[in-house]
């Protein structure tokens, strides 16, 4: 009885992994961008990039993180503008 449960589990696992999509299967599928080569570097799409939340009034530079903005000299103390 135990042997048949183990065999059944292996068969179900094999069927489940065979049904999952792989990079080679998805490469030709419409609407799917899949990197199927080794060492490929993925870059964020334009809509995935974070939008800047902070902007320096003096030099017009935009920042995503508040720490970068305040280290830059935000709130009127811009280090880039020479003030």
UniProtKB/Swiss-Prot annotation:
Subcellular location: Secreted; Host nucleus
Signal peptide range: 1-19
GO CC list: extracellular region; host cell nucleus
Molecular function (Gene Ontology), one example: zinc ion binding
Keyword annotations from UniProtKB, A to Z: Host nucleus, Metal-binding, Secreted, Signal, Transcription, Transcription regulation, Virulence, Zinc, Zinc-finger
Family matches, as InterPro entries: Znf_C2H2_type (IPR013087)
Keyword NAD on entry: no
ZnF segments: C2H2-type: 54-77
Induction: Expressed during multiple necrotrophy, the late stage of host plant infection.
Function per UniProt: Probable secreted effector that translocates into the nuclei of host cells to reprogram the expression of targeted genes by binding on effector binding elements in rice.
Name assigned to this protein: Host transcription reprogramming factor 9
Gene behind the chain: HTR9
